[in-house]
Amino acid sequence: TILEEVAFSCILLGESVKEANDHAMQVIEKLNLDPNASPFMLSRGQRQMVALAATVVTKPKILVLDEPTCGLDYMECLRIMQVVEDLRDHGCCVIMVCHDMEVVLDFATRLIVVNDGHILEDGSISHVFENKSICDEAALCAPLLCAVSQGLVKNGFAKCKGLYKRDMLVNALKKSCNL
């Protein structure tokens, strides 16, 4: 079962079966998985979530992810990224390869742009997306909120510079318009 598979990671680290099952259930519930389901009967996205759960349950200090949201539906993507964000918020260093710029915008704290095996840029999200030459060279398409922020700055809303989170952008506009 999914519960057995996820709990096995904790058992390997020396936890009792009860402790392992308790920890596994916490992660399984966050990912909205059926603990009694057979891993062999799951969709690709669900199998991906089980693999992540088996890793996350061990509370790693470093987590390396390669396209963790690839092929997932919107809700699966949100669940996975929420679990990853919780890990990061509790001190885990997360290194993620990702080509989905919306995911990058919502979850990354730093962006390293690699093109043809070479690092083009290493910096904040706003720094990278505001640098047109880097975006052009790496064929990066800035997410819509980046384009909106940059357009607002060009049209006199200087306080919108570098604001790529929806709430931050809305709040800056409210202040600028005295709302």
Predicted regions and their residues:
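Conserved ABC ATPase "signature" C-loop
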Residues: 116-117
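Conserved catalytic motifs of ABC-family nucleotide-binding domains
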Residues: 59
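Conserved ABC ATPase signature
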Residues: 38-42
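Hydrophobic anchor residue at the start of the ABC signature
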Residues: 52
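A short, surface-exposed alpha-helical micro-motif characterized by mixed small hydrophobic
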Residues: 104-106
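H-loop/switch region of ABC-family ATPase nucleotide-binding domains
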Residues: 98-99
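Catalytic Walker B motif of ABC-type/P-loop ATPase nucleotide-binding domains
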Residues: 63-66
